[in-house]
Structure formats: structure tokens, C-alpha cells
UniProtKB/Swiss-Prot annotation:
<feature type="repeat" description="LRR 11">
    <location>
        <begin position="424"/>
        <end position="446"/>
    </location>
</feature>
<feature type="signal peptide">
    <location>
        <begin position="1"/>
        <end position="14"/>
    </location>
</feature>
<feature type="repeat" description="LRR 7">
    <location>
        <begin position="324"/>
        <end position="347"/>
    </location>
</feature>
<keyword id="KW-0217">Developmental protein</keyword>
<feature type="compositionally biased region" description="Low complexity">
    <location>
        <begin position="1473"/>
        <end position="1484"/>
    </location>
</feature>
<feature type="repeat" description="LRR 18">
    <location>
        <begin position="591"/>
        <end position="612"/>
    </location>
</feature>
<feature type="topological domain" description="Extracellular">
    <location>
        <begin position="15"/>
        <end position="1057"/>
    </location>
</feature>
<feature type="domain" description="TIR">
    <location>
        <begin position="1111"/>
        <end position="1244"/>
    </location>
</feature>
<feature type="repeat" description="LRR 6">
    <location>
        <begin position="300"/>
        <end position="323"/>
    </location>
</feature>
<feature type="repeat" description="LRR 24">
    <location>
        <begin position="858"/>
        <end position="881"/>
    </location>
</feature>
<keyword id="KW-0520">NAD</keyword>
<feature type="repeat" description="LRR 2">
    <location>
        <begin position="170"/>
        <end position="191"/>
    </location>
</feature>
<dbReference type="GO" id="GO:0008201">
    <property type="term" value="F:heparin binding"/>
</dbReference>
<feature type="repeat" description="LRR 14">
    <location>
        <begin position="495"/>
        <end position="518"/>
    </location>
</feature>
<feature type="disulfide bond">
    <location>
        <begin position="830"/>
        <end position="845"/>
    </location>
</feature>
<dbReference type="GO" id="GO:0005886">
    <property type="term" value="C:plasma membrane"/>
</dbReference>
<feature type="glycosylation site" description="N-linked (GlcNAc...) asparagine">
    <location>
        <position position="891"/>
    </location>
</feature>
């Protein structure tokens, strides 16, 4: 690379002056690109400061090919991009990488035409993943890159791939589009049809991580050369959307097709053309597939690798892998599979090589599922629910090439000897984490090539002599974490090649005899057992043993001959035992040992144990009881030594080995070291851990000759002061980093010897380490009454103090005389401090028992503390000459008198403390000399009088404390003359209550309330009665003659009883309001549960809307398809059957083929209340669709009443602004609320007619149904063909019982692909079977009798054409008026008067609470689209138990009844359609019923076929 750069540098320098920035598109475009003439990304009204600009290297020019004149042409990369050679340095092809913020978004405009087209064969576009802005690819964006072979676009938040985006890329071989929209759930990625029509030569296509929900039909058909397709990490829900389903194998029968399914048939035929692709690799993992249907990948004849892992697949069809003739690797891991079909690998038996089924819920394993897969090499069944019942001799029969078998994390309890009879090629067998209790003899005998056997984490108790027979090449045996209490001495006799043996985590008490003479053993793990003693011959014959682990046992001593038979032992682990004695020389018998662990034992001395072990490199003796240590105890070759958590008080080096040792890492933390010096640490040390000791002293030059030092831990010790020489090291070269020291957590003292530590990291000379935790270091202040500790980095020079007794400056010449002002002598019983510059001089004489001012206080004293003494007075001129004194503490010293000259000369005094003394009065001139005083503390004295003007000269006074004295008439308003006063304290005095004085006092309190910190406690005293001055009522003052007078009228006392009553009433009223507010929800529920109150309320005009009276349904429920079970089986079951509501459910009752917005609005308008079940599934699926949002907006405008049921956890970040607005303005009920049902009933209107509990009016929901297949159906419609024949129930269930292991059998496929269908043994199941047969036969009869061609119409459509005149006067939800004359009206049928018809061939059993009812007139039936959802009062359903005999053509209409009762049976079928679908616990039957009942509709021409209709409904 360096040679290449040197080669092109002269060319670039020579042509850089002549090169002009130009784009390779058109000249007109060049003129438009001003500031971005050679940049892909241009900004659209956004500055660089608004969005983070991606790193854009400078434009690079590269010589490519030499022109005619010999000058090579240059490759001009855009400013946003950088390039690399695509094939080699000598090839002209270029791979270009561009880092953009976005592509054609609101922030940027993108121009790809500036990319040179001549040599660019690979283009990689990377957007900024942190910017959530929608990008866009324009049509023909890359049309000029005709030579482009590889295109990659990642992290660009694209929403659509248009059909012309890839125009011009005919040579494209590799395409990667990863928008990572999965991180932005609201943004889906859509691909238009024919988007890949131009790129027909595409070989690899990666569309992963795009949040794709659906794909156009046959989108990949044009890619005939495609070999690898990646669709992982999307939101695909149907395998058929990939377009690889082989529809040629699906059974079709044209004679059975209904005319009502013409539209569905056309739609199916349009997509039935299968694509013949040569795909070899397909990855559809991390999607939302639930079912793997038959022939789903049937067209991929050459597919070798199929990855469907990490989906939600729970059912797999019998022929799910049909057509995959070349499939070699199948990954179905991390799904919800419970069982697998028997013939799943029927077509791949001779080709499949790897099958991965781990992390599922497989509990049923067909014995023939994997049999005779003679090419299978790897089978992973781990992390399932497989028991020993499903594994027998036929499970793995014929797997003659299997190499890896993983059965770990299952529930196996035993292994039969014949299970592995054909696995003689198996090399790795994993049985970990099962429940095996024993291993039978010769279980593994057939596996002659097995080299790894994992049996850990089972319940094995004993290993007998024949359990491992036949394992001659076994090298790794893992038996750890079992319950082994013993091993037979001959257990390993056939495992002569065993190298690694794990027996840890068992209950062994001795070293097993079976280990002897295992000459190939390399490692043995006996840790975590109960071994107490080791015999001298325990390891006899283990001459090649490399590692021995005995951690966590109960060993107490090690003898000299314990390890004598282990000459090649290198690693020995004896940690966490109870070893107290080790005989000297015990480890010397193994000359090659390199690492020894003895931590966690009870050793108190190691002298003579390791000194003669020249090969020892690693030694851990931590957590023992060592009290002494010398470097002579370990060999000089030792490199790693751990001594932490012992009782060492010093590190001795009696033999001076600090230069001979090769120790690199030393850990002596958590000991009792008190001092370290240069000899305590070897010179070769690199890492030194001395933390958590008792170190107080670090000698100078301790680290001087440690040239390899990189880190030292000295934190959490007892270091108070540190000399700068203690951390000095030899100069470090520039190319090496300075050593890192950690010294925090020590009780440093801020003395004058440690001020250097604050600036050590800024020292330019490389002779001092870098303190890494300087910000965490605190130091203790020597003399500071405000704070004890301060962060070191915040300390000022005045905080670094040192003590002194006597000091004489160099310029002072009178120190030898007694009277010398420049001599600094600390008074007796005092402590004196100074800083480095002597600008701070502190004299501390507190509590020194002085009775008068101490003599010889230094003249330069800046702070004087004489508090706590026994002064009677402070005489005049006591502080004369101390002109630098700034702080004076004379408090608590029994001072009774101060004079005018006491503080003479203290011009610089700032703080004066005289509190807690016995001062009686202030005469007026005591503080006149203190013109700079800031704070004056006189509280807690006996001051009774203060002369006027005492504080007048204190112009800079800020704090004045006078509380706790005996003041009575001090004119406090004089303090207004002190402009800087911000804190005054006046409480706890004996202020006078005289009216004249008190008035002015109160006035001052009002004006200075912010300054007086104790104004609330200031009070006056009269006749031993205290009255607070700040109180507004009742404060007394006294006249001169002693007559008491209130400052406010006393008439208020007469009103006290009235005030008391008013107060009680006020409190009671607001208590009632507060109680009503707190229990408002409970009161609403109580009122709702009281029938009389609710009847009264809902009968009033305010509660009943006239329009709601005409709405046939009580509530319409919108919800997510994935929450259908919750809505149908819980909400609807309770509201419809138990309470009596009439509900319209979206996925059960609404016409799903109509436009979603119109269908949703129409269904909601048919109900009195709109209810939306809001869950995570609804947010990610339905709410992300525009139709749902627009419908909800329209409903809110019309109704303005929405009830939200919050179901499950709702991610707040995924709730958009519209939904948040609705949640704030609507009624929300949480499913987890313990009063959920009460609140829901309170939110819903009263049900229409409590007697008709199961009666549901669905004219606005079902009237528009078409016979098309439900687009929202999950797994129920995969196997159902359009218009397929439904065999009789007996035939279907007979087929179901033929195969006990099939997941989806043939009868289930014919009936709708429903999965497990048990034989109907219960009454409800038999009734459902009877109902399906009746409806199917009726549909056939209708197809045969009705001769009019065309599409079948619904009741509403027919009513529109035939009864236009009656439509105006008829309500939109009324029963259609064009029914046959004999048919009763919907609301006029009197079921109590209907006769019950019984047939001798059918015995009907009442499954409900009401009796069976049928019509009198056999011809009085209802149309199918109406009667299929009509329920008679009482909600009864019926079950026909006896078989019916039918003759001739009438058998098509023969049901569970005879004679003229056909109309009754039809009505019963409709009744069961409603009752069973809403109340049966088997909710999966609903899509089938929906499919068949949609076929029961009338023909267009009613007049022409009137007689046929009568016959039909007779």
C-alpha cells in the first residue's frame, strides 16, 4: 500500500493545479451544482449544525489507465465517498463507498449522477442510522452505472422500492437493501411489482431487516439466475407470499366449484403460475410465520439451504418440504413446534445432511421421522420437551452417516441399548441437562467412532463396568454435575483413548480407582466433590496427565508422595479446600509443574514449599492465614504471585532479590501492610496491587528503579501525607505511556507538604506517574470550622497548612532578643499553622484554660481562636499590632466586659465571634474601629441595653446576631443605616410591648422581613405574657399608665362560637366533596349495579339517544387479529352469553372483502358503542395501516365516543401522537383492573332485551359478506382449495385416526388445513360435525337447482334491485321484506308456540338451557345469509346422535331430521353457526364456518327462480 501511494503521489501533485472540479453527468447539471459540484448529498434547507455531518474524506484521485499521451486518467470520487480497488491494485475496477445522512429526504437532496460510471463496479451506500427521516430512491437513480455489478444500500429509511429505481442495472449481480426499518416500526418497506424486471441477471438478493409485511405476486419470477435470497428480519406472516408455492400438486375438482367463488377462483388462477427458480440459499428467519404449509417451497427444486428459524411456527404440513429435492440443510430452530409430520423428509431422505430443531417445544417424536435419512450428518434436537417415551430403536435407524447428535436440555430419563444401533459413525453425542438416572450396559457399544460424550447435568448415581463398552476412541467424557457416589474400577477399561475426564460436581469421597493406568489421560477434573484424603497411589499410571483439578473438596493435608506419579503435571488446582499442612517437597516431585492454586485454604507458612521449583510461573496463595512472607520463599522464575487476603504485615527481602526476581504481577491487597519501600517491590514488577491495606508510609524512591511499571493500586489505605519523592520514577520514554497510579480512598491531610499532588498530572517532566483517580481524592483541612474535608482539586493555597512552634524570617535581626515583633513564636498550649507563603498564620488556642489574653501572639496572625477559655474581660488594646487579623473567635469565654479600645488596630477584621459570653451592655464605641467587619455574633449573651449608634460605623456589616439576649428598648430600626445587612437575628429577647415602641418595631419587621431570619419568633413580653409580634390579631401593647390595650378590636372574641360552627361546617362540606371525588369510580359502579337507579337514569331523555334506539347492536369491537382468542373467548363469551349484549366483532362479523374503512365505519354505525381493544399487536399491525387510522378519525368525528380496552403491555415509544390524543380524550379500561367488568358495563349501554342473551343482530356486519376466503384467516385455510369437496364427517375422522404422529393429515387438509382434529366424541363436537355436513349439502343442492349464471348476490344487493320502492319506508336494519310469504318476520316469530318435531332416525339432545323449537310450516325457512346467524331465544344448540338414512338425490339435503323437517334443520344449522362460533371453546372452527355460510346466498333473479327457492328452503 505504501508503494502504491508513493507511485501515485507525483501524478496527483502534478495534476492537482490543473484539475477542475466537474461532475461526470451533463454540463447543464454541472452549472447547477455550485457548492456541491462533486458531492452526492446536498442539503435541503438544513444547516450542518442541525444534523450531524457524516465523516467525509477528501476527494481522492486515482490513476487508472494511460491515455494516448501516456498520462493516466483519474478516477474522481465524490466528496461523500471513498473507494478501494475492487479486484487488485493493478486493476481499474473500483468499489465505491458513500457515507450519507439520508437519501432524498426532507434534509438532503441526493444526486447519484456524479458517481463515475466507467470503472465503478461496486457501490455501497451507508446512511446515518441515528436520523429517523424517511428516505426515497428516485426513478433511474443509477441508470448511468451500466457496469455496476454490486449495489448495497443500508440504514437508509426507505419506504418504497419503485419499479424504475433499478433501471439501467442490467449487469447487476449482487443487490443488498437493508433499511433497518425494524428499528422504526411505523415505517414499512413496500416493493412494487416488476421492481426487479430489469435486473434479470441478479444472483444474490438481500432484503433483510426491512420491516416488509407483504410482497407482490411473483415478484422474484423474473430473477432466473438468482441463487441466494435473504428475507430475514421482516414481518412476513404467510409463506405463500414468497411466491414459491407449487400449486400444480394441489387437488382441484372443477365440478364442485360454486358459482359464488368465481371471483376467488380468478384471483387464485392469476397467481397460480409457479416460478421456476434456481435458488440454492433461502433465509426467511426472524419473521412472523405461524404455519409451514404444504408445497410452500415446492418450486425451489435446487434449494440446498433453508433457514426458517426464529419464527412463530407451531404447525407444519405433511408436505411442507415437498419439491425440495436437493435440500441439504434445514434450520427450524427457535420456533413453537410441538410435533413434526411423519413424512416431512420423505423427498429428502437421500439428500438431507443437517437438521436443526433446537429451542422448540417438541414433545412428540415420530419413530419414523428420521429413519433411513442415510445422508444426515448433524441432528440438533436440544432444548425441547422430548421424553424417553418417544425415543426407541426406530427413532435413529438408518442414520448411517450421522456425525453429530444433540439431545441436550430435554426430559430423557433412560436410554435403551438398541437406540443407537445404527449410529456407528457418530462422533459427538450431547445428552447434557436431561434426567438420566442410569446407563444400561452396552448402550453406546455400536458407536465405535464416538470421541465426545457429554452426560453432565443429569441424575446419574453410579457408573458400572459395562456402561461405556465399545467406546474405544472416546477422548472426552463429561460426567460432571451428576449425583455419582462411585465409579466401578473397570468403568473405563474400554476407554483406552480417553484424554479429558470431567467428574466435578458429584459426591465422590475418594479418587476413583478407575483412573489408574489411564495412560492417555491429559486432564482430570475432580472438583466440587467430597474427597477428604488422597492415597499415595491414587494417580498411579497417569504419566501423561497435564492438568489436575481438585478445587472445592475437603482435603486437609498433602503428603510428599501424593503427586509422585505425575511427572508431566503442569497445572494443579487445590483451591477452596481445608489444607493446613503441606509437606516440604510435595510439589518438587513434579518437575514440570507451572501453575499451582492453593487459595482458599488454611496455610500459615509456605517456607520451603516452592523455592526449588524452577518451572513454576504462576502461584496463587491468596485467602490463607500467612503472617510473613519473604521473596526467598518463591523461585526467581515466578512471574505471577497472588498473596491477597492474608495477614501479612510486611514484604521482606532478606536476601536482596529485588533485582534477580522476574515477578511481573504481584497482588498483596487486603493484608495488613503498614509500610512499603524500594526493597519491598521487585524491580521487574509491572502490575502491583497494594490496595486495602494499612499503609501509612511510602518511602522515597520506592518506585524509582521499576522500569516496567504500568499500574499501581494504593487506594483504600491509611496514607495521610505523601512526599513527592515517594512517587518519583526514572524518566519514561516518549513512546511509552506513563505508569497509572490509583491513590484515592486515603485520609490525606491538607498540609503544606501535599500541595504538589494537586498539580502532579500537569508536570511536564516524565518522572512522575499519572494519578488516575485525582478527582476522587479528598483531604482533611487542618483548621477549618466550616468543613472538615475538601476535594483535593478544589483546595486553595490557604488550605495547605503546616504547624510551627518558632519561626524567624531571614530578614529579621532581633530574634535573639525577647521583644521581637518579626519572630513567630506559638503561645503555650496553642497550635499554630502557616501556609507556604506565610500569608495565612493561624493561632489555635481554643480551650487552653487561659484567664487572660495569651502573650506573644504572633504579630502576623491572620486567624485567632481563643474561644473556650475563662476571660472575664477583654482589656483595651488586647490585640494591638495584629493588623492582619481577619478572624477572631472569642466566644464561650465568660467575657463580661469589652471596651472602646479592645479592638483597636483591627482594621482588617472580617469576622468577630462574641456569642455565649456574659456581656451586659454595649456603650456605643466598642466596634467603631472595625470598619471592614462583615459578621458580628453577639447571641446568647446578657445584653440588656445597646447604645444608639453602636453599629453605625459598621457600614460593611452583613450578619448581625442579637438573639438570646435581654434587650427591651433597642431601636432596631436604626439598623436600616447598615446597607449591606442581609441576615439579622432578634428573637428570644424581652422586647417591650409599649404601644409607641411596638408600633415602630412592627413597622420595621414588616419592612425587613426578608433580612430577619427569626421574625416569626420575635415577641414582646408584658406581665410575664409573651405575644408574637408577627401575629395579626390579639397582640397587646401597653400605654404609659400601664393600661393594657389591644392593637386590634376585641370584639372578635364574641364571635368565637359562630366562627367555630362555621369552621366545622366548612370542614364537613369540603370533606364530603373530597370523599365524593376520591370514591367517584366506586359510586359510579354502585349506581350502575343498582337496577332502579339505572332504569331511572336510562329512561330519562338525557341518557337515551333516539338514534341509539334504532341501532341493532349494543357494541362494535375492533381489535387485532392476533388478539382474536381473547376477544371471542373471554370478552364476547361473557358479554353475549352471561350479560346479554348484542355484539358485532370485526374479524367474526364484518365483511372483510369490502374496503376496510367503509366496512369499519358501517359496522361501528350499527352499534351504540364503539370499543377498541388496544394491544401491542394492534399497534404493530392494524394501527400501522392507513385505512384503520382514517376510519377511526371519521368515527371520532361522528360519534365522539370511544372506549379503549388496554390489553397487555403497551410500549410507550410506539404510541403515536394520534393514539395518545384518543387515549387522553376517551374512556380507558385496563384488562388487569380488578374491577374491569364493572367498569366495562358502566361504559357500555344497557343491553337490548336481557332475555335474548345469545341473540345477535348482525345486519350491519354480515349482510355484505362474499364467499371469498377470509384474508385474515391464520392457519385454517392453507390446505383448503377453492371449492373443494368436503367429505362426510365419518370419512374425514376415519382418516384422522390412521396416523397418530401426523401433524396435518389428509383429512385435515381437505377440511381446511386445521391441524389436530380429534374424533368427535363429545356432544358439542358431534353437533358441529352434523352442522357442517348439513350446510355443505345445502350448498351443493343450491348449485344444482339454481340455473341462473353469474355471481351470487347478498340480501342487501338483491333487495336493492327487486324492492326499491319499499326501501324508503323500511329501516336499514329491519328484516328484508322480500322473504317468502310463509317466512316469519324477524321480530314476530313466537317460538313458544312452535311445535317440536322429532324424527325416529335422529335423537336430539338439548345442549343449552332452553328447549328445542322448530317452525310449524316446513316451508317457512329463512335465507341462508340471514338464518346462518339467527339465534332463537334461549340460545339452544342441538346434537344429532343417531345416523340419518337418505334416499336418492334428497340425500344432499338430508340432515339430522326427516320428512318435512328440513327447514327446521336448516334453522338449527344457522343457530349452531351462531352459538357454536361465539361460545364454543374451540375457536379455530370459526374460519371454516365463515367460509361455508358465505355460500348460502340468494340468486339475482328472484322472480325467475321463485319456485326453486321454495324448494330450496322447504
Amino acid at each position: 500500500m505504501i508503494y502504491y501511494m508513493l507511485l501515485i503521489l507525483p501524478v496527483v501533485l502534478a495534476q492537482d493545479q490543473q484539475h477542475t472540479t466537474e461532475s461526470l453527468s451533463t454540463k447543464h447539471h454541472q452549472q447547477q451544482q455550485l457548492s456541491h459540484s462533486n458531492a452526492i448529498m446536498g442539503e435541503a434547507g438544513v444547516s450542518n449544525s442541525q444534523l450531524m455531518q457524516p465523516s467525509t474524506p477528501a476527494r481522492t484521485l486515482r490513476p487508472l489507465t494511460a491515455g494516448a499521451g501516456g498520462d493516466p486518467s483519474l478516477y474522481d470520487a465524490p466528496d461523500d465517498c471513498h473507494f478501494m480497488p475492487a479486484a487488485g491494485l493493478d486493476q481499474p475496477e473500483i468499489a465505491l463507498t458513500c457515507n450519507l445522512r439520508t437519501v432524498n429526504s426532507e434534509f438532503d437532496t441526493t444526486n447519484f449522477s456524479v458517481i463515475p460510471a466507467e470503472h465503478t463496479i461496486a457501490l455501497h451506500i451507508l446512511c446515518n442510522d441515528e436520523i429517523m427521516a424517511k428516505s426515497r430512491l428516485e426513478a433511474q437513480s443509477f441508470a448511468h452505472l451500466v457496469r455496476l455489478q454490486q449495489l448495497s444500500i443500508q440504514y437508509c429509511k426507505l419506504g418504497r422500492l419503485g419499479r424504475q429505481v433499478l433501471d439501467g442495472l442490467e449487469q447487476l449481480r449482487n443487490l443488498t437493501l437493508r433499511t433497518h426499518n425494524i428499528l422504526w416500526p411505523a415505517l414499512n418497506f413496500e416493493i412494487e411489482a416488476d421492481a426487479f424486471s430489469v435486473t434479470r441477471r441478479l444472483e444474490r438478493l438481500d432484503l433483510s431487516s426491512n420491516n416488509i409485511w407483504s410482497l407482490p405476486d411473483n415478484i422474484f419470477c423474473t430473477l432466473s439466475e438468482l441463487s441466494a435470497l435473504n428475507m430475514s428480519e421482516n414481518r412476513l406472516q404467510d409463506v405463500n407470499e414468497l411466491g414459491f408455492r407449487d400449486r400444480s400438486k394441489e387437488p382441484t375438482n372443477g365440478s364442485t366449484e360454486s358459482t359464488s367463488t368465481t371471483e376467488s377462483a380468478k384471483k387464485s388462477s392469476s397467481s397460480s403460475t409457479s416460478c421456476s427458480l434456481d435458488l440454492e440459499y433461502l433465509d426467511v428467519s426472524h419473521n412472523d410465520f405461524v404455519v409451514l404449509p404444504a408445497n410452500g417451497f415446492g418450486t425451489l427444486r435446487r434449494l440446498r439451504v433453508l433457514s426458517v428459524n426464529n419464527n412463530g411456527i407451531s404447525m407444519i404440513a405433511d408436505k411442507a418440504l415437498s419439491g425440495l429435492k436437493n435440500l441439504q440443510i434445514l434450520n427450524l430452530s427457535s420456533n413453537k413446534i410441538v410435533a413434526l409430520p411423519t413424512e416431512l423428509f420423505a423427498e429428502q431422505a437421500k439428500i438431507i445432511q443437517e437438521v436443526y430443531l433446537q429451542n422448540n417445544s417438541i414433545s412428540v417424536l415420530n419413530p419414523q421421522l428420521f429413519s433411513n435419512l442415510d445422508q444426515l450428518q448433524a441432528l440438533d434436537l436440544s432444548m425441547n420437551q422430548i421424553t424417553s417415551t418417544w425415543i426407541d430403536k426406530n427413532t435413529f435407524v438408518g442414520l448411517i452417516r450421522l456425525v453429530l447428535l444433540n439431545l441436550s436440555h430435554n426430559k430423557l430419563t433412560k436410554l435403551e441399548p438398541e437406540i443407537f444401533s445404527d449410529l456407528y459413525t457418530l462422533q459427538i453425542l450431547n445428552l447434557r441437562h436431561n434426567q438420566l438416572e442410569n446407563i444400561a450396559a452396552d448402550t453406546f457399544a455400536p458407536m465405535n467412532n464416538l470421541h465426545t460424550l457429554l452426560l453432565s447435568h443429569n441424575k446419574l448415581k453410579y457408573l458400572d463396568a459395562y456402561a461405556l463398552n465399545g467406546l474405544y476412541v472416546l477422548s472426552l467424557l463429561s460426567l460432571d454435575n451428576n449425583a455419582l457416589i462411585g465409579v466401578h474400577p473397570d468403568a473405563f477399561r474400554n476407554c483406552s483413548a480417553l484424554q479429558d475426564l470431567n467428574l466435578n460436581g458429584n459426591q465422590l469421597k475418594t479418587v476413583p480407582l478407575a483412573l489408574r493406568n489411564m495412560r492417555h489421560l491429559r486432564t482430570v477434573d475432580l472438583g466440587e466433590n467430597m474427597i477428604t484424603v488422597m492415597e499415595d497411589s491414587a494417580f498411579k499410571g497417569l504419566g501423561n496427565l497435564y492438568g489436575l483439578r481438585l478445587i472445592g473438596n475437603y482435603l486437609e493435608n498433602i503428603t510428599m508422595h501424593t503427586f509422585r506419579d505425575l511427572p508431566n503435571l503442569q497445572i494443579l488446582n487445590l483451591a477452596r479446600n481445608r489444607i493446613a499442612v503441606v509437606e516440604p517437597g510435595a510439589f518438587e516431585m513434579t518437575s514440570s509443574i507451572q501453575a499451582v492454586r492453593l487459595d482458599g485454604n488454611e496455610l500459615n507458612d509456605i517456607n520451603g514449599l516452592f523455592s526449588n521449583m524452577p518451572s513454576l510461573l504462576w502461584l496463587n496463595i491468596s485467602d490463607n492465614r500467612l503472617e510473613s512472607f519473604d521473596y526467598g520463599h518463591v523461585p526467581s522464575t515466578l512471574q505471577w504471585l497472588d498473596l491477597h487476603k492474608n495477614r501479612l504485615s510486611s514484604l521482606s527481602n532478606r536476601f536482596g532479590l529485588d533485582s534477580e526476581l522476574k515477578l511481573q504481577t504481584l497482588d498483596v491487597s487486603f493484608n495488613q501492610l503498614q509500610r512499603i519501600g524500594p526493597s519491598s517491590i521487585p524491580n521487574s514488577i509491572e502490575l502491583l496491587f497494594l490496595n486495602d491495606n494499612l499503609i501509612t508510609t511510602v518511602d522515597p524512591d520506592t518506585f524509582m528503579h521499576k522500569t516496567n511499571l504500568t499500574r499501581v493500586d494504593l487506594y483504600a489505605n491509611q496514607i495521610t501525607t505523601l512526599d513527592i519523592k515517594s512517587l518519583r520514577i526514572l524518566p519514561v520514554w516518549e513512546h511509552r505511556a506513563l505508569p497509572e497510579f490509583y491513590i484515592g480512598g486515603n485520609p490525606f491531610t491538607c498540609d503544606c507538604n501535599i500541595d504538589w499532588l494537586q498539580k502532579i498530572n500537569h508536570i511536564t517532566s516524565r518522572q512522575y506517574p499519572r494519578i488516575m483517580d485525582l478527582e476522587t481524592i479528598y483531604c482533611k483541612l487542618l483548621n477549618n470550622r466550616e468543613r472538615a474535608y475538601i476535594p483535593l482539586i478544589e483546595a486553595e493555597p490557604k488550605h495547605f497548612l503546616c504547624t510551627y512552634k518558632t519561626h524567624c524570617f531571614a530578614v529579621c535581626h532581633c530574634c535573639e532578643f525577647d521583644a521581637c515583633d518579626c519572630e513567630m513564636t506559638c503561645p503555650t498550649n496553642c497550635t499554630c499553622f502557616h501556609d507556604q507563603t506565610w500569608s495565612t498564620n493561624i493561632v489555635e488556642c481554643s480551650g487552653a484554660a487561659y484567664s487572660e489574653m495569651p502573650r506573644r501572639v504572633p504579630m502576623d496572625t491572620s486567624e485567632l481562636y481563643i474561644d473556650g477559655n475563662n476571660f472575664v474581660e477583654l482589656a483595651g488594646h488586647s490585640f494591638l499590632g495584629r493588623k492582619n487579623l481577619a478572624v477572631l473567635y472569642a466566644n464561650n469565654s465568660n467575657v463580661a466586659h469589652i471596651y472602646n479600645t479592645t479592638f483597636s488596630g483591627l482594621k482588617r477584621l472580617l469576622i468577630l465571634h462574641l456569642e455565649d459570653n456574659h456581656i451586659i451592655s454595649l456603650e456605643g464605641n466598642e466596634f467603631h474601629n472595625l470598619e471592614n467587619l462583615r459578621e458580628l455574633y453577639l447571641q446568647s449573651n446578657k445584653i440588656a441595653s445597646i447604645a444608639n449608634g453602636s453599629f453605625q460605623m459598621l457600614r460593611k456589616l452583613e450578619v448581625l446576631r442579637l438573639d438570646g439576649n435581654r434587650l427591651m428598648h433597642f431601636e432596631v430600626w436604626q439598623l436600616s443605616a447598615n446597607p449591606y445587612l442581609v441576615e439579622i437575628s432578634l428573637a428570644d429577647n424581652q422586647w417591650s410591648c409599649e404601644c409607641g415602641y411596638l408600633a415602630r418595631f412592627r413597622n420595621y419587621l414588616g419592612q425587613s422581613s426578608e433580612k430577619i431570619i427569626d421574625a416569626s419568633r420575635v415577641s414582646c413580653i408584658y406581665n410575664n405574657a409573651t405575644s408574637v409580634l408577627r401575629e395579626k390579631n390579639g397582640t397587646k401593647c401597653t400605654l404609659r399608665d400601664g393600661v393594657a390595650h389591644y392593637m386590634h378590636t376585641n370584639e372578635i372574641e364574641g364571635l368565637l362560637p359562630l366562627l367555630l360552627v362555621a369552621t366545622c361546617a366548612f370542614v364537613a362540606f369540603f370533606g364530603l366533596i373530597f370523599g365524593l371525588f376520591c370514591y367517584r369510580h366506586e359510586l359510579k359502579i354502585w349506581a350502575h349495579s343498582t337496577n332502579c337507579l339505572m332504569n331511572f337514569c336510562y329512561k330519562s331523555p338525557r341518557f337515551v339517544d333516539q338514534l341509539d334506539k334504532e341501532r341493532p347492536n349494543d357494541a362494535y369491537f375492533a381489535y387485532s387479529l392476533q388478539d382474536e382468542h381473547f376477544v371471542n373467548q373471554i370478552l364476547a363469551q361473557t358479554l353475549e352469553n352471561d350479560i346479554g349484549y348484542r355484539l358485532c366483532l370485526h374479524y367474526r362479523d364484518v365483511n372483510i372483502n369490502a374496503y376496510i374503512t367503509d366496512a369499519l365505519i358501517e359496522a361501528a354505525e350499527s352499534a351504540k358503542q364503539f370499543v377498541l381493544v388496544l394491544s401491542k399487536n394492534f399497534l404493530y399491525n392494524e394501527w400501522s395501516r392507513f385505512e384503520y387510522k382514517s376510519a377511526l378519525h371519521e368515527l371520532v368525528k361522528r360519534r365522539k365516543r370511544v372506549v379503549f380496552i388496554l390489553y397487555g403491555d403497551l410500549p410507550q415509544r410506539d404510541i403515536d401522537m394520534d393514539m395518545r390524543h384518543y387515549l387522553r380524550t376517551s374512556t380507558c379500561i385496563e384488562w388487569d383492573d380488578k374491577k374491569f367488568w364493572q367498569k366495562l358495563r358502566l361504559a357500555l349501554p344497557l343491553p337490548n332485551g336481557r332475555g335474548n342473551n345469545n341473540k345477535r343482530v348482525v345486519s350491519g356486519c354480515l349482510s355484505g359478506r362474499t364467499p371469498s376466503v377470509n384474508m385474515y384467516a391464520t392457519s385454517h385455510e392453507y390446505q383448503a382449495g377453492n371449492g373443494g369437496v368436503i367429505p362426510p364427517p365419518s370419512a374425514r375422522y376415519a382418516d384422522c385416526g390412521s396416523n397418530n404422529y401426523a401433524t396435518i393429515n389428509e383429512c385435515a387438509a381437505a377440511g381446511g388445513g386445521r391441524g389436530y382434529k380429534p374424533i368427535p366424541t363429545s356432544a358439542s363436537a358431534a353437533a358441529a360435525a352434523c352442522k357442517f355436513n348439513t350446510m355443505n349439502q345445502l350448498s351443493k343442492k343450491q348449485q344444482r337447482d339454481l340455473s341462473v349464471a353469474g355471481m351470487a348476490k347478498t340480501l342487501e344487493h338483491q333487495h336493492h334491485h327487486n324492492h326499491q320502492a319499499n326501501r324508503r319506508s323500511q329501516h336499514e336494519y329491519a328484516v328484508p321484506s322480500y322473504l317468502p310469504s310463509a317466512a316469519p318476520a324477524y321480530d314476530s316469530v313466537d317460538y313458544a308456540k312452535q311445535q317440536i318435531r322429532n324424527n325416529a332416525n335422529c335423537e336430539c339432545v338439548n345442549l343449552g338451557t332452553a328447549k328445542r323449537a322448530a317452525g310449524k310450516n316446513p316451508a317457512s325457512g329463512l335465507p341462508s345469509s340471514f338464518s346462518s346467524n339467527f339465534v332463537p331465544p334461549g340460545g339452544a344448540s342441538y346434537n344429532c346422535k343417531k345416523s340419518c338414512s337418505c334416499i336418492g338425490d334428497d340425500e344432499l339435503l338430508c340432515s339430522c331430521g326427516g320428512g318435512g323437517g328440513i327447514g327446521v334443520n336448516l334453522l338449527e344449522s344457522g343457530t349452531q353457526s351462531s352459538v357454536t362460533m361465539s361460545s364454543s371453546s374451540n375457536n379455530s372452527r370459526q374460519p371454516e364456518l365463515t367460509h361455508y355460510e358465505s355460500n348460502l346466498s340468494l340468486n339475482d333473479d328472484e322472480d325467475e327462480d321463485h319456485d326453486q327457492q321454495k324448494n330450496l328452503w322447504a
